[in-house]
């Protein structure tokens, strides 16, 4: 099994199966978490940790979009779903910066619980849509069926 990493992370065309999606998503998760941890220790305590998290998320937005776009194309989903996939990550990271300023209530408040429920619902949707469900059999509008799952 050979994976073209530049195409996986930097090309938004074509389709990928679940295996390549998980490899790419977990690689980005590891890279993003490692970079954020390093940057937090480098800049701490002078900068808000959520700001670093947003910066890392923004830097990884294009590779994240490419992986999500190709996997969602395999599922027969259009560009709207791919934009929502990446936009959701950016929006969640951005809201985490301003949430303490906007919410004067404790973390256990109804608004906090509602926000977390929305985050978890979106996360669950994309995990199932991209990582669990099979792609469309045969060629579709986005290209031929991937050779690997």
Q: PLM ranges: what are they?
A:
Residues 1-32, 64-79, 127-149:
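Membrane-interface extramembranous regions at the lipid-water interface
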Residues 22-23, 52-55, 83:
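Hydrophobic alpha-helical transmembrane segments
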Residues 25, 81-90:
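Central hydrophobic cores of alpha-helical transmembrane segments
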Residues 31-61, 88-125:
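Membrane-helix interface segments in multi-pass membrane proteins
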């Amino acid at each position: 099994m050979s994976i073209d990493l530049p195409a996986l992370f930097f090309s938004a065309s074509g389709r990928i199966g679940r295996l390549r999606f998980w490899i790419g998503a977990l690689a980005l998760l590891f890279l993003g978490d490692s970079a954020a941890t390093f940057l937090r220790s480098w800049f701490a305590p002078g900068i808000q940790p959520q700001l670093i998290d947003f910066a890392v998320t923004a830097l990884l937005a294009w590779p994240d979009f490419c992986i999500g776009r190709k996997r969602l194309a395999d599922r027969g989903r259009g560009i709207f779903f791919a934009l929502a996939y990446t936009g959701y990550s950016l929006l969640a990271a951005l809201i985490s910066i301003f949430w303490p300023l906007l919410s004067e209530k404790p973390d256990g408040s109804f608004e906090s619980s509602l926000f977390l429920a929305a985050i978890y619902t979106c996360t669950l949707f994309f995990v199932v849509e991209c990582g669990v469900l099979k792609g469309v059999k045969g060629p579709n509008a986005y290209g031929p069926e991937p050779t690997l799952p």
